[in-house]
Each structure stands twice: as C-alpha cells, then as structure tokens.
Amino acid sequence: MTPWYLYLIRTADNALYTGITTDVARRYRQHQTGKGAKALRGKGELTLAFAAQVGDRSLALRIEYRIKQLTKRQKERLVTEREAFEALLSSLQTPVLKND
C-alpha cells in the first residue's frame, strides 16, 4: 500500500492551500511550476508549510476535507503545533461503529 501525505502550502499573501499526494516533493514542484492546482497559479512564491504521512487514500481524503473546513487560525495552529495535527488525525482514525 502506497502511503498518502497531507500538505499545506503557503502563498505569497500568507494563505494556506491544503492538498494530498503520494509524493510531496513531486506535487510541490508541480505547484511551483504552475502545473498543480489552479487555485495556486499566479499566487507568487509558494512555500511548503507542513507535510505529514496520514495513511491510506481514504483517510487522506477525510483529513483533507476536514482541514479545508477549518479557519485560517486553526490551520496555522496545525502548522505550528504538531500535537494539534496529531489530535485531528487521531479523531479521524477512530472507527465508527455501525448498528446492524
């Protein structure tokens, strides 16, 4: 199973873009050369603010969705406090019990 990563890229105007990939370095290069997400094109200098392995694609999609719902302040906290990210990741890894 190929591991998936979540990453946050900071734009020149200090915005944070959230994405997932199996290869952070490759995806970051794509964004820098204008071959990544349209949302980052023309945004000036890009810096990789955060990256972490999150598991399989399903979990990566769930955490990406959850992070995209956060406020800018909450996203900044994930970048600066690893424990905040680990807590969020852990909350999404908890199995959901289904009633039969």
From Swiss-Prot:
Residues 2-77 form the GIY-YIG domain. It holds the Pfam family GIY-YIG. Disulfide bonds: none annotated. InterPro entries: GIY-YIG_endonuc, GIY-YIG_endonuc_sf, UPF0213_domain, UPF0213_GIY-YIG_endonuc. It comes from the Bacteria. PANTHER family: UPF0213 PROTEIN YHBQ. Belongs to the UPF0213 family. HAMAP family: UPF0213. This is UPF0213 protein YhbQ. It comes from Salmonella typhimurium (strain LT2 / SGSC1412 / ATCC 700720). The lineage of its organism: Bacteria, Pseudomonadati, Pseudomonadota, Gammaproteobacteria, Enterobacterales. The gene is yhbQ.
